[in-house]
Amino acid sequence: MMGPEDAGACSGRNAELLPVPGPMGQDGKTVPATSGFSGGAVAAEPPEEAGEEEAPPPRQLLQRYLAAAAGPLKPGLGGAEAEEAAAAAVPAARGSGMTNGDSGFLLRQDRRGPEEARRRRTCGRPCLLEPADEGVDGAGGLDDWAAPLEDPLRSCCLAAGDTDDPDPAAATPAGRAVESAEPSLGLPDARFGSRNTFEVSRRQSAGDLLPSAGPSAPLPAAEQGPGGTTARARRSGGFADFFARNLFPKRTKELKSVVHSAPGWKLFGKVPPRENLQKTSKIIQQEYEARTGRTCKAAPQSSRRKSFALEPLSTTALILEDRPPNLPAKSVEEALRHRQEYDEMVAEAKKREIKEAHKRKRIMKERFKQEESIASAMVIWINEILPNWEVMRSTRRVRELWWQGLPPSVRGKVWSLAVGNELNITPELYEIFLSRAKERWKSFSESSSENDTEGLSVADREASLELIKLDISRTFPSLYIFQKGGPYHDVLHSILGAYTCYRPDVGYVQGMSFIAAVLILNLEEADAFIAFANLLNKPCQLAFFRVDHSMMLKYFATFEVFFEENLSKLFLHFKSYNLTPDIYLIDWIFTLYSKSLPLDLACRVWDVFCRDGEEFLFRTGLGILRLYEDILLQMDFIHIAQFLTKLPEDITSEKLFSCIAAIQMQNSTKKWTQVFASVAKDIKEGDKNTSPALKS
C-alpha cells in the first residue's frame, strides 16, 4: 500500500490510471460513484445527480482503492468496457482534482488524441498539470460543478484515459466525445529511489500549473450543511485526514499536542527559532520561591565571618544511630543514657575544635603581624642601612632591627657583609678549586687501587669525597631539593668539593652540608662559597671542625659558667646525672642549629649570630635549656640526652627569643670573652675539671 507522499511522487514513466469499478446494480451495470475515495474534493458526476444516491461508506471506498491497486478488475468489466469507462470518465474528472496530501492522484479531463496520449505516456517524465483550454464546458474552462484543488503543495498528475495497449484502435477515441462516465483510478509506477521522487516531493507549490477554477454551481439542499457549507467542503481534509479522522483519532490528537507543545520542532521545512530566554539567578530564585512558598534569606556578612572563625568545622563525625534490625532494640533507659553520652561527647568535641580554631586564629594574626613588620623593615634595610653599612651597622636602631630578624630579601646580603671576606676569596678562585675537585672525582675511581700504598692524607681526602655524597642525601630531607635529582644537589656538591680542595687540612666534616645548604638558599653559588669558607675560618668553627680538643674544652667550660649563673637548678640536675655539655652542644655548634631547629627559626638565629658572633651560639643553647627547663627537670639522663638531640618541632621563634633575651651573658661583671680567657688560662695550668669526654 502506498502512502500520500509515495503516491504523490511519480516515477520515470507516466503510468495509466486503472479504472475503479463502481457498485454493481441489479441490471448488472455499474452505478456511478458520487465522490472520490477520499471523501474530499473529487466528484465523479455532475452535481444534479449527487443527491440521487448516498455516498458509499469510507470502508467501501477503501476497498475500492485497494482493489484498484491490486491489479485486475472485477468481473463484468472487460478490456473494451474498461477502456470505454476510462474514456468516459475523462470529462467528469476534468474539473475535479486531488492533491497528494489527499490521495496522491489528480483526475483531469484528457483532451489528447491516441497519439498524443501514447507520446505523453512514454515520455519518461511525470505528467504534470497543464493550463486548461479556454472555451471548454463554459467560460471558466472547467465544468461548472468542479471545485478547485484544496492543497496545491507537491502535486502531480496521473493521466486517465490511456491504456497500456499499444494498439491505437483499442485506445480511447480521439477528441472529447464522451461527456459523462465513471472516473478511472489507478496507481502510478512509483520508484522510490529515483531522482524524480525526490524532486516531486520537494515541490513547494504548483499553483502556476493548476487550471483556474470557474464558478462552481450551488449544490442541492441535501448537500448543504449548517451555515451554508457544503458537504464537499466539510470533507476537504484529504486522504491523510480521512485516515486520521476515521481510523486514528487518538494518534492525531497526540501528534497535534506534540506540535503545539514544541513549536521549535518541525520534521520538514524550515525550523522556526525557539525562544531561549537566559534566566538569571534572581529569576530562578523567584520562581523557586513562588513554586515552593519558601523564601531564601542570606545571612549577614559579619555573622558568616564570625561563625567561620569561631564555630567548629565538624563534630569529629560523631553520629548517634540505633542498633541494626537483626539485634534487640534498646530499652528506653539505655537509649536515654546513650543520648546523654552522645551529647557530652559532641560538646567536648566542639570545645576542642573551638579551642583549636582560636589557636589557629592567633597564629594567623601573629604571622600577619610579623609579615607586616618584615615588609616595613625591608624598606629601611634597602634604603637606609645597606647604602651606609659601615656607619650604621653598630647603631642601636640597626641592632634592634637585627634582633627582630632580617627580611628574607636582604638576608643573604647582610650575612655576606657581616661575615666578611678576610680570606680574599674571589669567584675565579672558586672556579679553580671547583675544577680541581671535578678532576679528583674523575680520577677517584681510576686510582682506587693505588690508594692503598699512598699516604694517609690521600685516604682521608678520598674518605671526604665519599662522605660528601653520603651526607648530601641526608641534608634537609624534608625539602627534597638537595638530594640527587634536586635543583640544588649539584651546587651543594660543588661547594663542599671545592672547600675540601681549598682547605685540605680541614677536609669535610659531618655538619658542613647543613651550613652550606643554608647559605645556598640565601646566596648565589660563588657568594655562598665565599661566605662558607670565611664562616668556617672563625675560631669557634675552626676549633670544632678541626676537632681541636683543647679549644673545644675551653668553650664547654665557658658555657658551664654561664649555665650555672642563669639556670642553677637545672645545672645541678645535670651534674647529678654527670651530663656534660658535649653531649648536646656538639651537634648544635657543628650545624649552627640548622639541623636541630626549624629552618625559619634557624635562619633567625643565624641573623643574630652574624651580629654578635660565637657568643650568641652558646646563648641560644642556654635559651633552649631555659625554654624546656621544667620538662628537663623531670627527666633522667637517657631522656634528657634524647630530648636535647631531637628538639620538638613546634618551637616558636617568639618563645625561644624571649628565653634567649632573659639569659644574662655576664658573670660577676665579666663578659663572654673575659670568662673564656680566664677558663683558657686555668686549663693551661692543668685544671681539667671539665667534660670527661674530652680528657685524654
UniProtKB/Swiss-Prot annotation:
Its main location: other. It is found in: Endosome. It holds the Pfam family RabGAP-TBC. The keyword S-adenosyl-L-methionine does not apply. Residues 209-222 have a biased composition (Low complexity). It comes from the Eukaryota. This is TBC1 domain family member 12. It comes from Mus musculus. The gene is Tbc1d12.
